[in-house]
Regions:
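Chalcogenol-based redox active-site neighborhoods
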Residues: 1-109
Length: 109
């Protein structure tokens, strides 16, 4: 599931842009819920370099792999919109994890 702070119209436009018909997309993620997921919150600065109007406040990217028991297997939390994991890399990693029964790491905190 992909979640966005964007409204339905803008979220739908992004889904069409990526060309996927198989992704489930949630929208209107509120800032308090984003904070619960430990996402970084940024203040909008008007139009981006590609002409998109930023929200007043919005969460920076996060990617969470959640196990069937609803615990986190892996989390990628970013403070900038750059160096996001590519979906093909995530899929390849998931295939490896499933095939090799690779355990979660970072569990000794």
């Amino acid at each position: 599931i992909i979640s966005s702070a964007d409204d339905k119209t803008r979220a739908t436009q992004m889904l069409q842009k990526v060309g996927s018909t198989e992704l489930r997309f949630a929208y209107n993620l509120d800032i308090e819920k984003a904070k619960e997921w430990d996402l970084y919150i940024s203040k909008g600065r008007g139009k981006t370099s590609v002409g998109v109007e930023e929200l007043d406040y919005f969460p920076e990217p996060g990617l969470f792999l959640v196990k069937p028991d609803k615990t986190i297997f892996s989390a990628y939390i970013q403070s900038m919109p750059f160096a996001r994991p590519q979906i093909k890399d995530v899929v390849n990693s998931l295939n490896f994890i499933i095939e090799k029964k690779y355990p979660a790491r970072g569990n000794v905190n």
